[in-house]
Amino acid sequence: MAPLFIAIVLVLLGIVSVAFLIAGAATACAIALVSSLMWVRSAGVLARQLGGTVVTAERRPNILSATEAARLVDVAEGLFAVFGLPGAEIRVLDDPAVNAISVGRSPDRGVVFITSGLVLLLDRIELEAVLAHELAHIMRGDTVSGSIAVLAFDPLRRYVPTFARIADKVAGNDREPFADLAAVAVTRYPPGLISALEKIDGAPIRRPSCLSRSVAESTSRLWLAPFDRRSDEPEGPGALDLAERVAVLREL
């Protein structure tokens, strides 16, 4: 619950402080109330913005063959059981980019989005490692703080530069390395995630083109392989790049 508590406190304190400066106490209280409601709705809103097709044993996106979809479902259901997330779901984004992201305001409402390009690129062991990484975000509460950073702070960064730093703090600059470690603790096979990250690092496209520009920009730091807000280039200063994350995993 710690990441959730910290995220809520930062949202309320940040927005209330700015409101006091701009419009006084009454407006501050009103905005604080709205931001609290935003927390409740944030993950659902972000999930709808991302879109994708839910993948189950009975349903698959056209981009995946029956065999590919069955492999994805089998791996996902096994990890749902290990993590204790029976209510989680997998959605596939029909896009050649190779990336994944997770959202959800609580563990029993988590959603993992994975691009079709990544599903087709990875073998079963690598796919398991990537899904474990994203489910670890859900279990750690990273998806809550990430959703709040996107919906509460990102729209304000254009007008108040300080909010760019606040958004990054709320999202968590160290979220990916910690999720890497949590994933290999579950799979007990670091080479699987190492191989997946190396393949992603060597792929030409990280930024999904199926997303609107605003959604891609606001979520850029929340993906398995973060990318620059304005381009497909890897994320800049403050983010641990994939090669560094691989180096950490090799030490295990």
Predicted features along the sequence, with ranges:
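Short, non-transmembrane cytosolic segments of multipass membrane proteins
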Residues: 99-116, 125, 138-139
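Short pre-active-site segment immediately N-terminal to the catalytic Zn-binding motif
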Residues: 64, 114-129, 170-173
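Hydrophobic, aromatic-rich membrane-embedded alpha-helical segments
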Residues: 149-166
